């Protein structure tokens, strides 16, 4: 049997398993909602103390503080009646790319113990929601005895499961990504809400063109790439906000209280930038393989490797955009915000290739099911 051979599908749909899958997906959404509010509580309690509000300055290396003290700050002389007042200027320390990361999670920045407790509860709830959602995906697959990504609804629920799995895997590897939890659960809830309200399709068998083992190879890698690109895009957005916040502080500006309480909880902008680059660079070769696998499948299904079908075209545009980002990130004058904008454009191309092409553009890849 070759990889291009058709796969054997179940003749009927197990409606009982399909209903169990729906129940599990809704249950996962409920647990994600609880996790989201737990993350909010962590950020609120973790940012209320004076120590927490000045946490950004505390993340700078002590060597910088020692050097600044040795040099001695400049002073401003003010006249207060007949007395000369020496005023120490405000010093804003900005973490450099080589400085250490901030402690993991908002509660680690000096917030109270209750904030840390909420953070641990949030992680536990996220893990529980991930397990429940994964069970829902498996039940969906079992109901039709095939891979659970034959339409947009199935792709969405599998995509969000993998995205949360990537986040939890990074936590398990002791990576400093706990700050992603709040934003991840919020967007996963949006993704699942869209899936169950707009994209929902009842369990059914695949269209004939998808009866191939390449379905397991090509689409699974596309889902994994999208999930990792998504994590990188969330980090890139946070990097842009954090960089603006640091720039405002460096120029003597005073950010709003809400911005300060939220953005100072994040790692330094240089750390966020490095994280996003590593994430996107790590998955880019797999995206290259995804496109190649799709071309091989296209030759088997339609007798040609490439035909500039809208889905193929936008997959290639996405590849070019991420290649430009990786090149810009290593080019002097294009690092930082300029490269970040390219990364967001690249992810926007990926999103359009999925939502825009599937829903609004016709072609040989019209398997949305909506």
Model-predicted segments: where are they?
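Polytopic transmembrane helical bundles with strong interfacial aromatic enrichment
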Residues: 1-303, 307-370
């Amino acid at each position: 049997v070759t990889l291009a051979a058709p796969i054997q599908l179940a003749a009927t749909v197990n409606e009982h398993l399909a209903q169990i899958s729906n129940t599990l997906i809704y249950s996962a959404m409920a647990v994600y909602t609880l996790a989201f509010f737990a993350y909010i509580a962590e950020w609120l309690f973790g940012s209320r103390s004076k120590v927490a509000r000045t946490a950004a300055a505390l993340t700078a290396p002590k060597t910088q503080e020692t050097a600044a003290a040795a040099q001695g700050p400049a002073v401003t002389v003010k006249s207060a009646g007949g007395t000369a007042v020496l005023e120490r200027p405000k010093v804003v320390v900005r973490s450099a790319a080589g400085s250490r990361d901030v402690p993991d999670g908002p509660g680690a920045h000096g917030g109270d113990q209750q904030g840390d407790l909420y953070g641990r509860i949030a992680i536990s709830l996220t893990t529980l929601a991930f397990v429940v959602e994964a069970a829902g995906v498996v039940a969906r697959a079992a109901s039709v005895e095939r891979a659970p990504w034959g339409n947009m609804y199935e792709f969405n629920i599998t995509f969000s499961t993998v995205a949360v799995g990537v986040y939890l895997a990074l936590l398990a590897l002791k990576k400093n990504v706990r700050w992603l939890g709040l934003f991840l659960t919020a967007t996963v809830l949006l993704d699942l809400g869209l899936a169950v309200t707009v994209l929902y399709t009842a369990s059914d068998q695949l269209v004939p063109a998808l009866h191939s083992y390449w379905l397991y190879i090509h689409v699974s890698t596309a889902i994994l790439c999208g999930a990792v690109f998504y994590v990188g895009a969330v980090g890139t957005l946070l990097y842009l906000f954090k960089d603006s916040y640091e720039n405002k502080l460096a120029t003597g500006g005073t950010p709003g209280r809400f911005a300060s309480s939220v953005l100072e909880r994040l790692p330094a902008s240089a750390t966020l930038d490095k994280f996003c680059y590593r994430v996107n660079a790590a998955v880019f070769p797999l995206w290259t393989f995804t496109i190649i696998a799709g071309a091989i499948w296209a030759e088997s299904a339609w007798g040609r490797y490439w035909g500039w079908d809208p889905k193929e075209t936008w997959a290639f545009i996405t590849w070019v955009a991420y290649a430009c980002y990786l090149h810009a990130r290593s080019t002097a004058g294009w690092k930082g915000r300029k490269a970040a904008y390219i990364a967001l454009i690249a992810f926007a191309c990926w999103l359009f290739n999925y939502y825009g092409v599937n829903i609004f553009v016709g072609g040989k890849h019209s398997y949305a099911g909506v």
